[in-house]
UniProtKB/Swiss-Prot annotation:
Higher taxonomy: Eukaryota, Metazoa, Chordata, Craniata, Vertebrata
UniProt KW Cytoplasm keyword: yes
Biased composition (Basic residues): 702-726
Official protein name in the record: Beta-adducin
Membrane topology: Peripheral membrane protein
Biological process annotations from GO: actin filament bundle assembly; barbed-end actin filament capping; hemopoiesis; leukocyte tethering or rolling; protein-containing complex assembly; synapse assembly
Gene label: ADD2
Biased composition (Polar residues): 665-674
Span list, region Interaction with calmodulin: 425-444, 704-721
Sequence similarity: Belongs to the aldolase class II family. Adducin subfamily.
Annotated GO CC locations: cytoplasmic vesicle; F-actin capping protein complex; plasma membrane raft; postsynaptic density
Length: 726
């Protein structure tokens, strides 16, 4: 067998190019077991191996010593960065989880159990504000332990959680003050029955809670009770004269009550006697030959009372032991030497600083909480007064330009969406604009470049109120009375009715000039002398003159349709063709007065000017038509009178005006045709070529009568249309 195994042991390693699975033989049992194992189990085994290594490193004494040495070295250098705090938390975790494994270290502060050990899941079941209450009570227990006031039994601090349900917080029996945490407190009712058990497995001391429950029942205003029986307080409680006003701390304590305490409060008579002895306002209760109890509306006030009471008892015991008797002590009068008015609310702040309300003993309690936090107790206390004052923000927008607010560092988180970023920037700009100490006015200033180009359009800019030049020298009216502009000796009811009427108009969107002020009725508004307004007025005047000059005569054919205008054009062309045919036959009829009239050389120049005159308004043509009818009547009565010059027959100038508006090319043809339109249609209206008047105008025949004014030809229906319709 040895000969068979030797070649296998001395076999060379597999080449690098060989696949991984080919390196193992398929008959190997270890390979078969690994291959048949599930993937989830394989991953779990790997994680367990990694955790085992981490646990071994954390449990090694060498690693802990190295970590503590690193923290001490960095603390000596004055480095208080976040990395040191993280290392300190790791050391606290190692110290709190493995007390028996490691020896006691010189860094005993870091080995303290944190006060605030409530996690997010634990806080969900708590009442409103209960988390902070638990942290405060646990912090008071730690302070009692640090000051050396804690005793092995009956040293309890209780707190009322809610007045409606009468639930209270108390530490479990058998837990020392240095071990109390926020989660280990037990919630009980007024009878001492457990409502909510803490993280510890210890019970509640119902005998010790009887005194607290009796005080809570007698005084509903009390929320916190601290019970002490230190040597100093027990000695003062055994003296016949009680606490003497021999020190400043004794005056700060306030009124005190004394009660003969037998150790139990089970009987109803004991509770009644305690209630009579305590009274409605007393905050200190001295239990004869036992100790003291401090009451408070808050935890801060109760600790403030017990702190000064303990100091006053220590001073009194020391003074009596050194003086030899009460007759050798100087007692202070409370009326003369009262330093402060002891109350539930005090004012905190300097003479020139902002004044704000603070509870009694709140500043002192916050200082002690900062001390515990610096020692690593992690109190979880919420500070109302920050220790480091924030820097005052600059009010001048010149020192901090607007571009600084929009600056973003590269190491910031993911980029904000553009719409949200724009909204945030708008809000910041609005806030900065509203908080600015400067006052701006919107001013219209004429731009120099635009003024040189001839455009008087102003440019809108924002200027400071001090830099704006006042356009008028008038004095502004200061409104001192809301009814300043109401006339004197008026009925208030009328004023109210007018106000309601104006409001009703505003609701209905009725625009009006509004009420006029009688005080300002005689004030004459001065005309603005600014160059921009003058230029605007001049330009407006020029535009008005241009508009007046460009006014045209109203078109008499504006109401006609395109089809009617086309028919009118065709009719004019047809008449022109008929006139051309008549002109060709004119030499054969020399006696025709209608054809000899246009060729007469003695024609009046007024008539030629009338035929070649420009556009005439319809009103003028109507006036001429009336004159024409009058002259025609006169001609019938007086046959020897001549026809007046410039008479227009059958509205010829209206047709001439329409032709010039329609087309310039047709205007010349229509003017020549219009002179003979009436002669072709009505031969009786033509002027005879017989005897001439002395002025050179042809006289009218008395036998032929003038017809009345008939409708224009374009308004009549043509014969062709009549035939088609028939």
């Amino acid at each position: 067998m040895s000969e068979e195994t030797v070649p296998e042991a001395a076999s060379p390693p597999p080449p690098q190019g060989q696949p991984y699975f080919d390196r193992f033989s398929e008959d190997d049992p270890e390979y078969m077991r690994l291959r048949n194992r599930a993937a989830d189990l394989r991953q779990d085994f790997n994680l367990m191996e990694q955790k085992k290594r981490v646990t071994m490193i954390l449990q090694s004494p060498s690693f802990r010593e190295e970590l503590e040495g690193l923290i001490q070295e960095q603390m000596k250098k004055g480095n208080n960065s976040s990395n040191i705090w993280a290392l300190r938390q790791i050391a606290d975790f190692m110290a709190s989880t493995s007390h028996a494994v490691f020896p006691t270290s010189s860094m005993n502060v870091s080995m303290m159990t944190p006060i605030n050990d409530l996690h997010t899941a634990d806080s969900l079941n708590l009442a409103k504000g209960e988390r902070l209450m638990r942290c405060k009570i646990s912090s008071v227990y730690r302070l009692l332990d640090l000051y050396g006031w804690a005793q092995l039994s009956d040293t309890y601090v209780t707190l009322r959680v809610s007045k409606e349900q009468d639930h209270f917080l108390i530490s479990p029996k058998g837990v020392s003050c240095s071990e109390v945490t926020a989660s280990s407190l037990i919630k009980v009712n007024i009878l001492g029955e457990v409502v909510e058990k803490g993280s510890s497995c210890f019970p509640v001391d119902t005998t010790g809670f009887c005194l607290h429950s009796a005080i809570y029942a007698a005084r509903p205003d009390v929320r916190c009770i601290i019970h002490l029986h230190t040597p100093a307080t027990a000695a003062v409680s055994a003296m016949k004269w009680g606490l003497l006003p021999v020190s400043h701390n004794a005056l700060l304590v306030g009124d005190m009550a004394y009660y003969d305490f037998n150790g139990e409060m089970e009987q109803e008579a004991d509770r009644i006697n305690l209630q009579k002895c305590l009274g409605p306002t007393c905050k200190i209760l001295v239990l004869r030959n036992h100790g003291v109890v401090a009451l408070g509306d808050t935890v801060e006030e109760a600790f403030y009372k017990i702190f000064h009471l303990q100091a006053a008892c220590e001073i009194q015991v020391s003074a009596l032991s050194s003086a030899g008797g009460v007759e050798n002590l100087i007692l202070l009068e409370q009326e003369k030497h009262r330093p402060h008015d002891v109350g539930s609310v005090q004012w905190a702040g300097s003479t020139f600083g902002p004044m704000q309300k603070s509870r009694l003993g709140e500043h002192e309690f916050e200082a002690l909480m900062r001390m515990l936090d610096n020692l690593g107790y992690r109190t979880g206390y919420t500070y109302r007064h920050p220790f480091v004052q924030e820097k005052t923000k600059h009010k001048s927008e010149v020192e901090i330009p607007a571009t600084v607010t929009a600056f973003v560092f590269e190491e910031d988180g993911a980029p904000v969406p553009a719409l949200r970023q724009h909204a945030q920037k708008q809000q910041k700009e609005k806030t900065r604009w509203l908080n600015t100490p400067n006052t701006y006015l919107r001013v219209n200033v004429a731009d120099e470049v635009q003024r040189s180009m001839g455009s008087p359009r102003p440019k809108t800019t924002w200027m400071k109120a001090d830099e704006v030049e006042k356009s008028s020298s008038g004095m502004p009216i200061r409104i001192e009375n809301p009814n300043q502009f109401v006339p004197l000796y008026t009925d208030p009811q009328e004023v109210l009715e007018m106000r309601n009427k104006i409001r009703e108009q505003n609701r209905q969107d009725v625009k009006s000039a509004g009420p006029q002020s009688q005080l300002l009725a005689s004030v004459i508004a001065e005309k603005s002398r600014s160059p921009s307004t003058e230029s605007q007025l001049m330009s407006k005047g020029d535009e008005d003159t241009k508009d007046d000059s460009e006014e045209t005569v109203p078109n008499p054919f504006s109401q006609l349709t395109d089809q009617e205008l086309e028919e009118y054009k065709k009719e004019v062309e047809r008449k022109k063709l008929e006139l051309d045919g008549e002109k060709e036959t004119a030499p054969e009829e020399p006696g025709s007065p209608a054809k000899s009239a246009p060729a007469s050389p003695v024609q009046s120049p007024a008539k030629e000017a009338e035929t070649k005159s420009p556009l005439v308004s319809p009103s003028k043509s109507l006036e001429e038509g009336t004159k024409k009818t009058e002259t025609s009547k006169a001609a019938t009565t007086e046959p020897e009178t001549t026809q007046p010059e410039g008479v227009v027959v059958n509205g010829r100038e209206e047709e001439q005006t329409a032709e010039e508006i329609l087309s310039k090319g047709l205007s010349q043809m229509t003017t020549s045709a219009d002179t003979d339109v009436d002669t072709s249609k009505d031969k009786t209206e033509s002027v005879t070529s017989g005897p001439m008047s002395p002025e050179g105008s042809p006289s009218k025949s008395p036998s032929k009568k003038k017809k009345k004014f008939r409708t224009p030809s374009f308004l009549k229906k043509s014969k062709k249309k009549e035939k088609v319709e028939s």
